[in-house]
């Protein structure tokens, strides 16, 4: 049996709150401790280990301590890199440190690795524009998998278009065919799907906590523990104890009653929740809404509200949006800048430190990127 964990995004402080950063560390350690308690043979981390390529010391230590506990329990760890782990300008991703110290095994280079009688292979996040360069490598690893008699696990951090058209970079037909389990990352919602042309289930455990790109909603988060004691892998869902989130709709005319009902719901919870009210109606007065929302402040970790405008078909204009906000930002930035590399530099590397007013760090990143660009031109 092994654990399949993905999109941990260690270091993310949603809404700038330390409590949200600690929430992620809490669910992450819960997943690791559960894996140890259940005596899994190994753990797969399917990318986006960290939220940014240059994570804080706290985030680095959280991962290191978890890997140490796993290793002390006789449990091996394997990982690939997601786009949040990879900087466009830094040559060595932080997770490589764990590989070099033998805390974990990096398998994102496409080279097969045999763990006891299980065949493992993985690929780091591949951009859509790079996929054509990977067809031969996919064929090579597929051939090696076909010749192996036991279980074969492919680890990737990719979106599949048949599962999510917004965040998909490749179709299921592009993937190697001869694996018995596809340990996927990148999509933050849980999916488990079988394709007739693939040798096993395609599994996305989703993120371990709700992240900024997912909005505020009541959603279960967790990971898979996969039984491979028989010919067919059996993925079992393990739910993690995340902070409660409440998303409600309310009519402006009944706002007082709606907030009272939310307060009653909050009274039943063990933790202060994150709350969003979507308010519709005629002649909405923001000052009145703000005054009513103040009733929630002391009982929530974070609360916000949005006015819902109806279009001519009487449907909400806020309900239509891409599932993966990060990828949509990169798409829009690519269009504006004329370069996907520059867009990823801006969104992945510069946006967070700029938001925290880390001007010196941003300046250094820009200088390093310029130096790399100049060397390429020579």
Outline where the language-model segments fall:
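Accessory, non-catalytic peripheral segments of nucleic-acid enzymes
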Residues: 230-378
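A short, well-ordered alpha-helical element
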Residues: 29-39, 139-140, 255-269
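Short loop/turn motifs at secondary-structure junctions
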Residues: 39, 119, 150, 178, ...
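Domain-start "cap" segments at the beginnings of catalytic or binding domains
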Residues: 1-22, 210, 221-243
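N-terminal active-site segment of His-dependent metallophosphoesterases
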Residues: 1-66, 146, 353-364, 372-378
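His/Asp/Glu-rich metal-coordinating catalytic cores
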Residues: 42, 53-220, 224-227
